[in-house]
Amino acid sequence: MSRVGKMPVKIPEKVKVSVDGNVVKVEGPKGKMHFPTNPLVSVQVDKGEVKVARQDESHVAKGLHGLTRTLVKNALEGVVKGYEKGLEINGVGFKAEVKGKEIHFTLGFSHPVVFKLPEGVTAEVDAKQTKLTIRSVDKHLLGLTAAKVRDLRPPEPYKGKGIKYADETIRRKEGKTGAA
């Protein structure tokens, strides 16, 4: 039995969970989300708890058991608290600006870079326009969006210019030494 998968997940107040075939739907104060589950795993809702069970003892089903339980837990946490990820923009003249569902970046290219936010993701920039905070109820979508934003201009190791996660440390390199 999966140690993670066998533990039931308590449903918080003001949250509705429903299972429709292989789709789990979660609604809460911050929003709603749904995700598919594998047919090898079944999800049941009873007495304020969500329980995950696997259909057989195959290697794949054992792996999906714990995964599905964690996805349910993340969905419940997301619709109650929400998730956020911070990004920092380093470099002379590098900045970001949120306009509706788009983020406009000035990243040292000859043109501005426009990034369209996916549905269910919001962003805000601080007053200096160098700290970007991305928020969503879907942890997976939030991580994907943050990674795509970082890929617009990843930090380089010599000066550290670029977009990095707020909690990320960049391994710096020394420049060339003088010619001998």
Curated annotation (Swiss-Prot):
Molecular function in Gene Ontology: rRNA binding; structural constituent of ribosome
Family: Belongs to the universal ribosomal protein uL6 family.
Entries under Gene3D superfamilies matching the protein: Ribosomal protein L6, alpha-beta domain (3.90.930.12)
Protein name as catalogued: Large ribosomal subunit protein uL6
An example Gene Ontology biological process: cytoplasmic translation
SUPFAM superfamilies noted in UniProt: Ribosomal protein L6 (SSF56053)
Assembly and interaction partners: Part of the 50S ribosomal subunit.
Record-linked NCBIfam families: L6_bact (TIGR03654)
Task performed by this protein: This protein binds to the 23S rRNA, and is important in its secondary structure. It is located near the subunit interface in the base of the L7/L12 stalk, and near the tRNA binding site of the peptidyltransferase center.
Keyword list, A-Z: Ribonucleoprotein, Ribosomal protein, RNA-binding, rRNA-binding
Keyword Cell inner membrane in annotation: no
PANTHER family: 60S/50S RIBOSOMAL PROTEIN L6/L9, LARGE RIBOSOMAL SUBUNIT PROTEIN UL6M
Record organism: Anaeromyxobacter dehalogenans (strain 2CP-C)
